[in-house]
Every structure is written in structure tokens, then in C-alpha cells.
Amino acid sequence: MKIAAAVLILLWLTVPVAAQQQHKPEMRAYSYLVYWKNARIGYQESTWKTETVDGEHRDTITDETYIKIKRSFDGTTFEIKESTSKVYGPDWKPLSQVNERSDGGQKTRTEVVYSEGMISVTEASGQGKPVKFEITLDGKNYMDDQQAFAKLKSEGRLKAQERLSFDAFSSSDKALVPCTWIVGQVATRKAKTGETLKGTSVSVVQGGARTELLLDDNGLPLWVWSSAMISAERVDKIPVPFEVESPPEIKSSMEANAVIPGDDTQIERMEIHFKFPVDDGDGVPPLLDSNSYHDVVRWEKGKQTGYAARLKSQRLPEDFKAPAFPLEKVDESAKKFLAATPMCESEDEVLAAKSADVVKKCKDARDAATALCKFVFRYLAKKSGNSGTATARQAYDEKKGDCTEHAALFVALARAAGLPARCVSGTVYLAGKDEAFWGYHAWSEVWLGRWVVVDATVNQVGVGARYLFFQYDEPGETEGSGRTARCLSNDFTPIIDAYRLKGRDEFRLENSKKFEFR
């Protein structure tokens, strides 16, 4: 549900510049209905309070959001409630922000303080200890969204083809991310309520994800659309009682065109392709990159476009030698993945004690990673927990979870044992006896002298060639952000062209396509 929350942030990204000129307290209220694939899934009620505090101008923006949605693979329905309050000083200078989020059984509180040259973030999930982050602004072209709108308006640049690029703060990524505003024409749009909305169209590309806006004369959103197929429209009021219109299912799996026989760890290579529109550019990265998981090429045939990938085995070589355990030396680039995060509470006393108990007899780092992977695989029941995405401690307490919880718990336990580890997301090929499918998936990587893939959901340290990499789901790691959302809004269905099992010749499917990989 991170997708939905990220989109709703854009509902308060612009506030009337005129409000900064007020001298007496004034309150404004705005309401929005939220949709996913044309089904009403929630709402947001926003208030803007303008006042003078100790002789200085203040604007406080408060948003109350509710969303309800359902997953396709298990039919689980989640309710998300979120409250955000942000305070601004003169010239839309951000001062502070507090966000409280309830996702099923999980509660998260995030506090942000803006100071000269620094953004400080403190976040705590459930009963976990608060985790602090500091983002340095030195040398950065940092700007808040409200400041960006005010700049465009004051300079007379709210007209077609005008662009403004800057570094924006992403509270979800705990990092500065590139942001570009591209101003379009004055446009009209028919709302789902039947009302005609008219305003200035603006395309916002932030952190690799694109969002389309329709703004009124004061810069307030009339309509919002994201690449995740989530949209919002301003309305006069929220219906009472509010009812969700048949919560839509998030399509989390796609049927595969072939069942590869045998043990999936023995897949040494797999070639696939899929149709996908050209949706990158202007700061949006390609959907796939060539990396240790796969080689990638883009293809075009007539009006059709897409990607082809040659997936590589991630199994450990037979002569792999892991460093002794506990680790005595860690690469500088891997050290940051030893720190606790709100999702992976490696400093939690209960998790730290369990980690120490699991690895107490391990002699090398591979043995330790294998023991932790095996523990997580056996400990967590393979079913959804009480929230869309649980923290490691919450998953441990509930003793259940899907792939996301397996990855988070493994990473937390590995870090507690002194092994750098990180969460990864993408898609994976899974096969049974008679059927196979591709599913959105989360797994881990652990540093054993080099990065090694770990999938605790299936108890594998080192995996076969069946993973498509999207991004690292860690604070500060923004590369690839938004890729899952882009797949959800398009008909993303990988087609297997060929594969090779260990010790066997390549098998190419009938009528398959062949691409030249570098």
C-alpha cells in the first residue's frame, strides 16, 4: 500500500499562494474522493489554517485519509488510515511535519523537522524503537512542492512547456529525489461525479514515478492521476456514510506460458520478453536495467514496444568460500545495511536474542545466513498478517506473513547477527507440477564477502534464474522506485522464450522470439 500513500501526498502539494498574505486566522477545507481503476476506494479531507504566531506567518495543512483495497492472490482486504499535519513559515518554508498511519494492525509515526541545511526524520513502527535519519541539503537544489508552485506563479511560468527541476524530499524513501514539474495547457476533465473540472495541467515526475495533475487558479489539485492507476477528484463533500465501491483486487500474479520442469534452483538461464509502453523519460527510468540479475534489451515492432531479458542464475558456485563468522571485515559500501530501520528492527531485543540463538554454532557467514533463512522459512506461516506490510517484529509476533514479511524478518535477524542485508522487490517465476505463474515478490540479499540472493519464503540461499529485479526497498535507495506501480497500470505479462537447466542444453519454446543480448 505504499503506492497509494505516495500518491495521496500529492493532494496537498500545492496551497494557494494568496494564503501567505493573510494576517488573520483563516480556515479552508477541501475534500477528495480516491479511485483505483475507476472504483471508489477512499477519500481525503484536508484543512488549511492560516494564522500569525508570535508575529510570524504560519500555514498548517492537515490531511485525513482513508483507503480500502483488496489483494487478488488471497482476497485479503486492508484498511489504511493516515493523518498528516505539515507546518509552513513565510514564503512556504517547511518547518515540521507529523504523519500517523494505521495499516491494519500496524501503526507508524513519522516526525520531520526542517532546519537550515538539514532534514531530520524520526520514525517508529508499532512498539519498535524510533529510528532517526538525517538528510543533508548542502549543495542540493532543495525545494518544497509549495515553494515550486509559488516560484512558477510569481515568475509568470504557469504556461505550457515551462519546466522546473529541483531536489524534493521523499518521506517514504527518507531521501532527496529528483523532481521535475512540466506545465501543460489549460484543460478540462469530466469528473466521475459528472462535474466538469477546468484548470492547468501539470506533469510531476518525482523519484522515478509520474503523476498528472489538474490545478485550479490557486494551485490546488482538482484532479490527480498516478502511474499506479490511482486517481483523486475534488468534491464538495464526502458521502456519509462512506462506502467503498467493491474494493478492486490488485493483480499480484500473472499466468506463465510454460512450466519449467524440475527444481527451479537448477534454472541456469531464462529468456523472456513482454510488451510494455514507452513510459520512461523526463526522469522516469526504464522499467528494467541490465545488472547481476539479468541482461536487458528493448524492442520495437510497428506500434508495439517492450523489453526482453535474459535472466541469470544466482546460485553460489561450488567453490564459494564464505568469510568466517562473526564477520571481521565488511566493505564500506555494505556497512549502511547493518543499521536498523523502521521495517527491519535489528536492534529490537527480542529479535537480537533470537538471531544470536539461531547462529550461535555457525562457523562461517554462509552457515549463519543459511540458518537464519531456514528459521524464517519454518517460523512464519505462509499467509497474510494483519497489515499490508508488517515490520520484522510484527511478523515475528504474529508468526505469519507473505514474502514481504519473510524478507523483512530475515534482514532484521541478519543485521542483528552482524551480516549486512537488504530487502529487494521485483517479480519471480514460480512453477508447480501442472501450472506456473509470475508474481510480484520480495526477497533479500545478504553480504557474505559479496552480495548473495536469499529467498526466505522458499528457504533458498542462492537462487535460480527466475527473478526480475525492480529495486532495493531500503531508506535512501531510490533507484527503480515506481516500477511496480507502472507494471500494475499496464498489462505486464512476461512470456518465456527459452530456458536452460543445469547440465542440459537450451530448450527454446515453439514460435518463441529471439533477441540479441549484449
Question: What residue ranges belong to the model's regions?
Answer:
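Bacterial N-terminal signal peptides
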Residues: 4-14
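Sec/Tat signal peptide C-region and signal peptidase I cleavage site
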Residues: 15-19
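Acidic, serine/threonine-rich low-complexity disordered tracts
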Residues: 20-118, 122, 135, 154-319, ...
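Acidic/charged, solvent-exposed loop-and-adjacent secondary-structure segments enriched in E/D, K/R, S/T
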Residues: 125-139, 372
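Secondary-structure boundary elements
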Residues: 145-148, 317, 322-401, 476, ...
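Active-site rim recognition segments
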Residues: 236-238, 243-244, 329, 419, ...
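Active-site-proximal structural scaffolding
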Residues: 365, 369, 403-407, 437-440, ...
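Cysteine-centered nucleophilic/redox motifs
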Residues: 372, 399-427, 444
